[in-house]
Amino acid sequence: MTVKTRFAPSPTGYLHVGGARTALYSWLFAKNKGGEFVLRIEDTDLERNSQEAVDAILEGMKWMGMEWDEGPYYQSKRFDRYNEVVDLLLSEDKAYKCYASKELLDEIRTEQEENKEMARYDANHPKIVAANAAAKEGDASVIRFRNPKEGSVVFDDQIRGRIEISNSQLDDLIIRRTDGAPTYNFVVVVDDWDMGITQVIRGEDHINNTPRQINIYEALGAPVPMFAHCAMILGDDGAKLSKRHGAVSVMQYRDEGYLPNALNNYLVRLGWSHGDQEIFSQEEMINLFSLDAVSKSASAFNTDKLRWLNNHYIKTSEPEYVANYLQWHLDQKEISLDNGPAITDVITLVSERCNTLIELADQSRYFYEDFEAFDAGAAKKHLRGVAKGPLELALAKIEALQEWTTENLHNVIEEVCAELEIGMGKIGMPLRVAVTGGGQSPSVDAVMQLIGKERVVTRIKMALAFIAEREANA
């Protein structure tokens, strides 16, 4: 039997990190078993759905690298199938029409609460029986599933173990509303049955839905999939994760400069572990993932940990991989790569210092664009009269270079230090400010090599002019 998992988001908002982790676990489980991963859009709530949300979900899935084997399927296009199954249940007396109005049900619920009874639907309540008896053909009705009254629903949750719910706690679920719209718990069963889903991995907020759905599977004679319910994700303060804890949308993390491999690595560890290992390639995640190692306890989202992982992936990933995702940020900042070194060379040089792709884009700018002014603090400290001699000597030697290599540029700096009998900082820092515009960069000889001779010469002359003007105004 082919293992089949699914991710079934509702398009009423963005793809949030909780949903993304559920999708990732489902995707990894399928890949680990050599199975298939299905994407289904649960868009039966026609009033709240939006195409914008659908597009955001698909974009988020693709950005994270979770390509689906089937789909996306849309529930809104399957209403005929749902009605067909409703009719089947009606014909077998496993479902029935209920004519009790919302007002009547509210009245009964109020009475139950006043009598300190469990508020629930009871098909045998005298008022409901009377309402059904008085109904005429054509009156508005819902369709309810006839839930078993005896026994229990027992299932082995692959994360939480054995779960048992008494049928006496479950009422007769509405499976089709008065407007003809099918309900969530019903269409999920029909979809999973039709699509051959063998494994349902979802959030723990669905545990109460599972026994209801199992009873529908059994009424239809459909195979019941295995279930696994993941614990929720909390903020670092122990409260349920929300916008106040930072970004919650997958694409917001893209916008803030995170790599998908870093986010995937972080999300997989929010509840799953393999010994003490922290860093997992996609291949390792697929090979090692197991629901047996998923925790029953909630996990706390820690942005500092995510930033650490992102820095690791920026530093250690192939430059071509980083460049692919960096390009979006370069475009946002209107940094053109037309006039400068290969971006992969820049990434190799500057990535060590960058926690996000936004920082990487900012630190790439001076390789491609000239600046009109120096950073005020760096210039005040390093572009002073004492730097004039070292910069002039360095400029002369740089202009005379026949071969533009990092080694030759390093030799220039050493020669200036030797001839003027000064420490490395007396020329290194003024040079850094001169060629980058600021006070922080990787090794200045390597930076100059990538920037190119013409730009380096122009920028050193600009720094000398700045020093001259500063002295004139002193």
Swiss-Prot record:
Reaction(s) the record says it catalyses: tRNA(Glu) + L-glutamate + ATP = L-glutamyl-tRNA(Glu) + AMP + diphosphate
A Pfam family this chain is assigned to: Anticodon_2
Enzyme class: ligase
Short sequence motif named 'KMSKS' region, residue ranges: 240-244
GO MF, one example: ATP binding
Domain of life, source organism: Bacteria
InterPro entries per UniProt: aa-tRNA-synth_I_cd-bd, aa-tRNA-synth_I_codon-bd_sub2, aa-tRNA-synth_I_CS, aa_tRNA-synth_I_cd-bd_sf, Glu-tRNA-ligase_bac/mito, Glu/Gln-tRNA-synth, Glu/Gln-tRNA-synth_Ib_cat-dom, GluQ/Sye
Name of the featured protein: Glutamate--tRNA ligase
Annotated source species: Aliivibrio salmonicida (strain LFI1238) (Vibrio salmonicida (strain LFI1238))
Name of encoding gene: gltX
